[in-house]
């Protein structure tokens, strides 16, 4: 954008028709690179897809070529996503959104794997999988790859990026405008609605809207039952076997008879409920709208539903576009088994120093870490009062270099405590009275 006139001089897009929340994140980074003995001014932007977008900042032309790949089309009424998306080879992407249903589901234990696979029973994955009303979508990347803290460039023109690799579920469902079902006289007078209130409303709510817990607190989910007769067959909705399987992990709701260990939902109840859902969908069809939200995919230990590492730190050579190294960043702890796993969710950021040090923060273990910029080796770590919540800063005062950490904790599930600390360090060699 021309700062004087506001005119758009050029633009470059990563994800077309983005319905996955795969935005370009972090502040743009400016540097210069050598191409065929010519110095080119470039601007670098990072995407949650894992792509590193590097273009000539005068012309907007990408430094490296890219191609297009075919992807699925969306299935929302009257809407389709783009049939093609950009595919970058260089700079090498530091992550991918593709979730492999066969290999990426957690293998930490049979119990955890079984739980996650059950959560994914109606899900699909792939390369930019199309969101739709009949299937959930599971991808990496809703929180990166890279995230809002962005990356940093060191004095050897290497790009350092903290990134995430844990999956999210994207769901779409029908809802009623203003949620009027439980105040609709035509509906509430139905005898079958009383059956619903007695057996289902404690989880799916009196207005059938269900519950999708915020990822800031957890991953509880009870699907909306609005429009269900439009989406599923009568056979599947009245099958007692399917009902029991779908409620396999619903031990906290009133499905079991404690005396006989039998389900207290019977075939006659399912038949009655199907008739109710059919009537409700007929009455409210003109008021039904589509809602879509995402949620972390967690296992029953509240760990990400994929295999660790769940967070990385990486370095990319900006001249060649090649990844130089990639190491796990942070430690995740299973609060049930007390086991530690390398690489965790991170929302802090990095800075680099002229001496070849990378300083990184933002993991849930509340440590800030110091790395060798040449190889990614961890040199030192320091525990903060709360998780780092923004990139570290460095400054000079009376000839001494200081490093500061904004330590306030995180807002997503698993970050635990929050506060308002700002923690500053300086070199021991500066700790003389005249420099204080």
What positions do the PLM features span?
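Beta-propeller blade signature
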Residues: 1-6, 56-60, 311-317, 418-431
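Phosphate/diphosphate-binding loops
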Residues: 27-77, 427-429
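Blade-level signature of beta-propeller repeat domains, shared across WD40, Kelch, NHL, RCC1
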Residues: 156-162, 168-174, 393-436
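Generic long, charged, amphipathic alpha-helical segments
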Residues: 290-293, 318, 322-378
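Electrostatic cytochrome c docking/interface patches
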Residues: 174-195, 211
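Axial heme c-ligation environment in periplasmic c-type cytochrome domains
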Residues: 202, 211-230, 234-283
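Repeat-blade elements of multi-bladed beta-propeller folds
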Residues: 22-47, 85, 89-93, 148-152, ...
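Conserved blade-ending motifs and adjacent loop-strand segments that build the rim/top face
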Residues: 15-27, 67-74, 134, 138-149, ...
């Amino acid at each position: 954008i021309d700062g004087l006139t506001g005119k758009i001089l050029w633009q470059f897009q990563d994800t077309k028709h983005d319905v996955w929340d795969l935005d370009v994140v972090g502040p743009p980074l400016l540097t210069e690179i050598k191409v065929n003995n010519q110095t080119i001014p470039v601007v670098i932007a990072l995407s949650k897809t894992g792509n590193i977008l590097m273009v000539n900042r005068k012309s907007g032309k990408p430094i490296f070529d890219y191609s297009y790949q075919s992807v699925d089309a969306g299935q929302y009424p009257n809407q389709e996503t783009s049939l093609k998306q950009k595919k970058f080879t260089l700079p090498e992407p530091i992550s991918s959104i593709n979730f492999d249903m066969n290999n990426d589901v957690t293998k930490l234990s049979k119990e955890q794997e079984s739980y996650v696979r059950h959560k994914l029973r109606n899900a699909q994955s792939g390369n930019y999988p199309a969101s739709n009303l009949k299937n959930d979508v599971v991808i990496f990347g809703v929180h990166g790859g890279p995230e809002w803290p962005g990356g940093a460039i060191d004095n050897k023109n290497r790009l350092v990026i903290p990134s995430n690799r844990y999956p999210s579920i994207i769901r779409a469902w029908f809802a009623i405008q203003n949620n009027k079902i439980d105040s609709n006289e035509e509906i509430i007078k139905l005898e079958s609605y009383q059956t619903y209130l007695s057996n289902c409303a404690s989880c799916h709510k009196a207005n059938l809207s269900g519950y999708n817990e915020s990822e800031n607190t957890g991953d509880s989910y009870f699907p909306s039952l609005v429009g269900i007769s439009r989406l599923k067959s009568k056979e599947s909705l009245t099958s007692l076997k399917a009902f029991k399987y779908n409620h396999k992990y619903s031990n906290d709701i009133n499905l079991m008879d404690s005396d006989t260990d039998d389900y207290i939902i019977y075939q006659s109840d399912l038949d009655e409920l199907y008739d109710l859902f059919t009537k409700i969908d007929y009455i409210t069809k003109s008021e039904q709208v589509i809602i879509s939200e995402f949620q972390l995919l967690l296992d029953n230990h509240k760990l990400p539903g994929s295999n660790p590492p769940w967070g990385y730190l990486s370095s990319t050579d900006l001249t060649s576009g090649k990844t130089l190294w990639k190491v796990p960043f942070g430690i995740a702890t299973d609060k049930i088994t007390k086991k530690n796993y390398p690489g965790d969710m991170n929302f802090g950021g990095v800075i680099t120093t002229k001496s070849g040090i990378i300083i990184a923060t933002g993991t849930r273990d509340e440590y800030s870490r110091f790395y060798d910029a040449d190889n990614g080796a961890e040199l030192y770590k320091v525990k903060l009062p709360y998780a780092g919540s923004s990139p570290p800063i460095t400054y000079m005062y009376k000839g001494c270099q200081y490093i500061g950490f904004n330590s306030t904790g995180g807002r997503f599930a698993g970050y635990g405590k929050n506060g308002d600390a700002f923690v500053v360090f300086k070199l021991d060699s500066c700790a003389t009275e005249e420099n204080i």
